[in-house]
Amino acid sequence: MKSTARLQIADVTVQFGVASEVAYDYLSDPGRRAEWQASLLRVADEADVGEPGEAGSSWIDVTAVPFVRPTMEVVESRRAQRWREIGRWGPVDAALTLDFEAQGKHSTLVRARAHLTVPLVVAPGLLGVRVLAPTALAADLRTAARLLENRQTTDPHQEAS
């Protein structure tokens, strides 16, 4: 008998007014996450493999929720195409996949899909998470898009680094 349930909790798409490489470099860098992710205070114990956010890189998310400190790992990184992380906290796994679709030289669609794997007994109680997660994830991505667009307006030659 299956003891866990995997649930999609969000599938959102946000337009970024920057090149896909710029959006990718910013969103995949763990050290930049607290700038745009509302629930994240900071990252700790960052261990990069190559560039920040490349497959195999890991860190701990220090969240605004007391005692929630998931260990994060990048499991897929294809620059300007796809980035995927998995966070583990106790019996819970959370996966986030970001897909990047260039819409021109300075325009990118970012699709974010989030899944939770939880003990089967917990799954029925996740209705609130499934209702709130898409709104929260879209808001975080809109914040990132706005920050990047403002940065480009201030200095059109500046990259996300």
Predicted regions and their residues:
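Short, highly charged C-terminal tails/helix-capping segments
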Residues: 40-46, 142-161
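Short, surface-exposed coil-to-beta transition loops
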Residues: 9-11, 67-72, 92-97
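A short, glycine/Asx- and small/polar-enriched loop/turn
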Residues: 51-57
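Beta-strand/loop substructures that line and gate deep hydrophobic ligand-binding cavities in soluble
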Residues: 86-139, 155-157
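Hydrophobic ligand-binding cavity/cleft-lining segments
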Residues: 1-51, 161
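A generic beta-sheet turn/junction motif
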Residues: 16, 63-65, 78, 89-91, ...
